[in-house]
Amino acid sequence: MKKLLKLFSFVLVAAMCIAMCSCAKTGLRSKPVDLEHVMPLLMYVGCGDDSGKASQPAFTDEELQQLTDAGINEYVLLTTFMPTYYCDIDENGNAVGEPQRLCTKEDIYTLTAEDLGLESDSEFDLTNAQEKIIRDSYVTPADNKSTINQQIDYEIELAKRILAINPNAKFWFSLPHTKIIEGATFYAEHYMDVIYPKVKIAFSEEEFEKNVGGLYWSTEDAGGNAFDVENQVDFGNPAVKAAKYCSDILHEDNKTLMWIPYTSAGRQYERIGFISNLTDVFDYVYMQPGYLWHAEKEPYVGYIKSSVEAGAVLNSNGAIYGGEKKSSTVIGVEIELDRKVISGKEAEAHMTRYNAYVENFSQFKSDKLIAIYCSNSNDMFVETVTELLFQWYK
């Protein structure tokens, strides 16, 4: 009997070890989650460049009231800002010390051949690749050294203004675009040391629980050479590694990471599929058709429609990338809208393409599998554009 018990114990421990090793080799949560569906409006706020100034046009209180009256409760606060600097923060979220680089030359020289997706292991090739990144991407912006601290302050300010009007609003704050994609993990570490703590500090415990949905990953692609489909933790890709670092922290607080990637032929669309179907790095993935501005992207309307219907990213033949949907990721579509549908030489063509969105994607309104892009406040509150926007929330 004792021998049988020992044998059973051995088998049980071995099975647990195998299970743990198996889990360790995926980018999935420890168990599936059923995520709330949300239908966010994207709102530009704050910095549009390295000046540190709020170059995006501000929303008026009257405009924020109109958004609330239209039934809009979820917002992504975003920026076109591609930052270079950050400042450390104190316990109150205030910047301390001088601005520092998010990714330094020293950081770049720590990147390995595997990080860079190099086939060669030679030191010569690695050094050349590192120095090419520095030449191509390591730029020095204006002397004012605007920081991620300034941008998140603008986002928090707008969120508080919306909350004063709509106490049920929920927000996703931006993790700005990574200027040096190969060094994305360095950006991510500083983002989660500065941006996320500042959000936590800015809101009461009750507000953080109720009104903060999470963060928005602004880098719209999974660039870089490295992408190993056999590595279903992060594919060895710098952008996915960085995003996973952020989402792991968010998931500990029951918060989510949102991604709205652009679609294009070739590896970008394929990568969206593998990331979305096989990992829980991103909790919400709303794919951009791009058709509103690019007539040649019409096929993506059909691809995305089929994917949202299936709840998994499908290839052009209708097959699931990765073979099956393993993740809890919510798959949706971004509706693109701006004043080009009513003004300019190609307004009629833009409106025709916009109507294709209405025809193909309106079915997803009731399940809230839609995010809405409507440019900045200057475009959003042009009369006809506003009416078209609000139709999605009726």
Show the residue positions of the predicted features.
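Bacterial N-terminal signal peptides
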Residues: 10-19
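Sec-dependent signal peptide cleavage junction
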Residues: 18-29
